[in-house]
Amino acid sequence: MANTILTPITLWKDFDDTLPFNEEFLSKEEREGAVMRDVYILGRQTGFGRVKIYGRYYTPNGLESFPAVLIMFEAGFPCDEKLVMHFIRKGYGVLGIDYSGELGDGRHTIYPRDIDHANFARAGRAMDYVDETARETSWYEWTAVARYAARWLKERPEVTAAGAVGLRTGGEILWKIAPYAPIDCFISI
């Protein structure tokens, strides 16, 4: 099949990021002036189910409301606790999400089997090439995860404003969600 070039408008026009999150908090731990919670939220619907997005949500201890930051780390790398704690000390909440998917042991974003190419370790051609349309790439799925995560963070009742920080691959993803996501500002590093 010949490649089909899609503009950003046509690429995302049928995307539905309004489905309910059905969040599931898994654990709660207090440390260094923060409360850390592991959370799963549901993302986009595919033919084989919904993406189950894994994240860690940090909130500053003792604050009822605060601004928050979505952090998109480098693909395949774990959370940078030092960076997270920098924001916590400044009074921000932080949501660090996994978009890399299955990389080994531990909690991760779970992609339905029809979009297995979203798992960073198995992305293959879907990361570097567009064989049909951009919708069949890892980048599309990672961007979809970021759109859901940004909306979840912005809709939290305790969050007064939401920004985002992206590191390397995470920064590239932020450029892709900027026109669509409910974030007030972002920086790509």
Regions flagged by a language model, labelled:
Residues W12-E64:
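N-terminal cap/lid segment of alpha/beta-hydrolase-fold proteins
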Residues M85-A144:
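Cap/lid segment of the alpha/beta-hydrolase catalytic domain
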Residues R147-I189:
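Primarily recognizes the serine-hydrolase "nucleophile elbow" in alpha/beta-hydrolase
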Residues E74-P78, R168-G170:
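Short beta->alpha connector loops
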Residues A68-I71, V94-I97, G163, C185-S188:
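Structural recognition of the beta-strand scaffold that forms the well-ordered cores
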Residues Y54-Y57, E64-E74, V94:
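Short beta-strand element of the alpha/beta-hydrolase
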Residues M1-I9:
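N-terminal low-complexity, Pro/Thr/Ser-rich intrinsically disordered segments
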Residues K82-H86, K176-I177:
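A short acidic, amphipathic alpha-helical/loop segment
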